[in-house]
Design a protein with these regions (language model features):
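Bacterial N-terminal signal peptides
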Residues: 12-25
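TPR-adjacent "capping" and linker segments in tetratricopeptide-repeat scaffold/adaptor proteins
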Residues: 42-56, 125-133, 285-288, 332-340
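Residue-level recognition of tetratricopeptide repeat
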Residues: 53, 86-88, 171-174, 212-214, ...
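Structural register within alpha-helical repeat arrays
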Residues: 53, 60, 94, 138, ...
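Inter-helical turn/loop elements of alpha-helical hairpins
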Residues: 69-75, 94-130, 138-152, 185-194, ...
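Short, charge-rich amphipathic alpha-helical segments embedded
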Residues: 75-107, 167-176, 213
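Amphipathic alpha-helical segments of tetratricopeptide repeats
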Residues: 82, 119-120, 162, 166, ...
Length: 365
């Protein structure tokens, strides 16, 4: 059935929805048994050539990767390398943290440097990897060292991951990362059934096997993040934050669906939780203030204004002003906070125009 869905390239959106709903009629039964480490990021079943603490650090890194928590994932992959320098997949994981495809961010130099480090270990003392793990490394090489521009290399990477998933049909991680890669190719249209249905079908099959897989839930929300498909995203949206509550991004992601459906109070709740989780992480790890989740902070502003909660919106502007002052006093990089302050102020005044709230948000700059 899934093969026939993927093969049909010209089907109307209504028919696509019916086909997907047929997939949703079968709830998942399988559960993973791999530990997620100290952070509550969900569980996965990902056999590796490493064991012990190196394996635990690696699995936590992959879980963070599934929630686009790239700095945290990088820390865990580096710890896995330190514990087991011959563990090839630990280098694969760190290379993965330098590509943020759905955010259009890619650090090619950093990725190539990690692969060069892996090659140096291979040449000096050899690597511990299986043929399947070698397939992961070969795939990521196409993204960083392949021919052509980044769009061409994304196409090649997506094809390589799809081959890996087909060669190892029991590897849920290969299938999940393959689906993400397909969404990342140039021209992928979230409102086009021809693009959405094959990827969604692949993810729905994974969901049937493991309905609490954090990557599957995350990527389902992304693939359904458009007006025609948003109702299908409610299922993963209701679960993802519960599965990976340590991740600010996991707490934020359900609001993509809630926003499409104009469920603004739920957008508020999601992004309050998401921003606070990022504050906890930033303070616990002693990182600069600009590394907080200001994306969720911005969505919180949008939701407050949509609900005419002008006092709350003004409170965000004042909080941002206070954070800027603190960061400047510490001599920290301000990141996008100054531009966000200007955007918030303009956004507030535009939304409040013609109301008693106009001009009422006094901020000393």
């Amino acid at each position: 059935m899934l093969a026939s869905i993927a093969a049909r390239r010209l089907i109307p959106c209504a028919a696509s929805l019916l086909l997907l709903l047929a997939l949703l009629a079968h709830p998942a039964q399988a559960q993973s048994d791999a530990p997620g480490g100290a952070l509550d990021l969900g569980t996965i079943d990902f056999p590796t050539s490493a064991s012990g603490e190196a394996r635990t650090e690696f699995l936590t890194g992959v879980l963070a990767l599934h929630s686009f928590w790239y700095p945290e994932a990088r820390d865990h992959f580096r710890r896995a390398q330190a514990l087991n320098p011959q563990f090839a997949m630990a280098y694969w994981g760190e290379a993965m943290t330098h590509d943020h495809p759905l955010w259009d961010q890619h650090d090619n130099d950093a990725g190539r440097a990690i692969l060069a480090q892996l090659d140096a270990v291979r040449d000096a003392s050899g690597l511990a990897w299986t043929d399947r793990e070698r397939g992961y490394v070969d795939a990521i090489r196409t993204l960083y060292t392949g021919e052509g521009d980044i769009e061409t290399r994304r196409d090649a990477y997506a094809a390589a991951m799809q081959r890996l998933a087909e060669q190892h049909p029991d590897d849920d991680e290969a299938a999940a990362f393959s689906a993400l890669a397909q969404m990342s190719v140039e021209g992928f249209d979230l409102e086009d059934a021809d693009d959405v249905v094959p990827v969604a079908a692949q993810l729905e099959e994974l969901y049937r096997r493991h309905d609490r897989h954090p990557g599957v839930l995350h990527y389902l929300i992304h693939v359904y993040d458009s007006e025609p498909f948003a109702p299908l995203g409610l299922r993963p949206a209701r679960t993802y934050a519960e599965v990976a509550p340590a991740s600010s991004h996991a707490l934020h992601m359900p609001s993509h669906i809630f926003r499409q459906l104009e469920q603004w109070e739920r957008v508020v709740a999601s992004n309050q939780d998401a921003y606070q989780a990022s504050v906890d992480w930033q303070q616990r790890t002693d990182r600069p203030i600009h590394m907080r989740d200001f994306h969720s902070f911005g969505w919180l502003m949008d939701a407050y204004l949509a609900l005419d909660r002008f006092d709350d919106a003004c409170g965000l502007i004042q909080e941002l002003e206070s954070l800027l002052a603190t960061a400047e006093q510490r001599g920290e990089d301000l990141g996008r906070m100054p531009s966000l302050r200007e955007h918030f102020t303009s956004q507030y005044e535009s939304a409040a125009a013609g109301t008693d709230a106009a001009g009422a948000c006094a901020v000393v700059q």
